[in-house]
């Protein structure tokens, strides 16, 4: 991708600035996935295919909370990538494809170092595949594929741009990216479940005092008015132990479990209130858009 910025300072002196990124052809009718940060703020986006053809791309929608964007081009005879049917596992060989530093399409090889990485502070929702395949500026938004060329993830970030973080790169899982793709095509935005609470993790001594095995448990600190949690009868001070039978160990996991729900889905909450176990049934709402 090339994204162009038209900046005027002073008004009579216009300068055009461009940057590069990569993307993945997801459908045969021209829908493309890339990173939100690759196209954020762009006045025009041009996509170049491997065969050398170029086309202006239309931005269909973005999801800043997970750093994905959907583009659309109008070209014939385009081949979408195939999705991997295997769950990503530590030790799997993967290939990162992109356009590092604008030098042209390149492939780097690595292995999956970890899965379900979260708590990195990169995105609101994190469930990264960690790999040691070389990722550089220009690779963002490109595919991470298995040895058969099937999509495993969307390359998104490196931990740091210093030599101390070499070999630590992150990709958004293909299953997550495909869900966002479908949401944006249908709704123009990502659709996620929402309860409407703020919570903090129980300290180990507090968890033990309540008979929980640390780090299990989140204590509710605030409930949004007229939210699903409000209507379900949750109260500040309630300790959420499980959500739909998933043990709650931290805010990141709880957010991911709720966000993966569709609005209208039932939510079974196992909570502690005043030292007594209680089951509360709620109905997931729609997560508000973050500006």
Give, region by region, the residue ranges found by the protein language model.
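Serine-dependent protease modules
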Residues: 1-209, 213-216, 221-225, 232, ...
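Conserved catalytic motifs of ABC-family nucleotide-binding domains
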Residues: 237
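Conserved "HGTGT" condensation-loop signature of ketosynthase/thiolase-family condensing enzymes
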Residues: 240
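Short strand-turn-strand beta-turns centered on an Asx-Gly dipeptide
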Residues: 243-248, 274
């Amino acid at each position: 991708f090339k994204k162009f910025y038209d900046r005027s300072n002073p008004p009579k002196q216009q300068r055009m600035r461009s940057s590069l990124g990569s993307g993945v052809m997801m459908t045969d009718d021209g829908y493309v996935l890339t990173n939100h940060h690759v196209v954020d703020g762009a006045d025009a986006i041009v996509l170049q295919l491997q065969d050398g053809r170029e086309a202006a791309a239309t931005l269909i929608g973005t999801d800043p909370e997970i750093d994905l964007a959907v583009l659309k081009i109008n070209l014939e005879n385009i081949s979408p990538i195939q999705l991997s049917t295997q769950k990503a596992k530590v030790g799997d060989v993967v290939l990162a494809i992109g356009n590092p530093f604008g030098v042209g399409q390149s492939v780097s090889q690595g292995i999956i170092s970890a899965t379900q990485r979260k708590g990195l502070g990169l995105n609101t929702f994190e469930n990264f595949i960690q790999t040691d395949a070389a990722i550089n500026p220009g690779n963002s938004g490109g595919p991470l594929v298995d040895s058969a060329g099937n999509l495993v993830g969307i390359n998104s970030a490196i931990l740091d741009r210093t030599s101390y973080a070499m070999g630590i790169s992150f990709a958004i899982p293909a299953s997550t990216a495909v869900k966002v793709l479908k949401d944006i095509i249908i709704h123009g935005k990502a659709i996620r479940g929402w309860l409407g609470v703020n919570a903090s993790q129980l300290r180990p001594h507090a968890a033990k005092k309540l008979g929980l095995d640390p780090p299990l448990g989140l204590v509710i600190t605030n409930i949004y008015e007229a939210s699903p949690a409000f209507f379900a009868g949750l109260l500040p001070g309630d300790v959420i132990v499980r959500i739909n039978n998933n043990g709650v160990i931290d805010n990141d996991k709880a957010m991911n479990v709720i966000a993966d729900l569709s609005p209208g889905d039932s939510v079974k909450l196992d909570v502690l209130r005043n030292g007594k176990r209680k089951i509360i049934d709620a109905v997931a709402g729609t997560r508000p858009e973050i500006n």
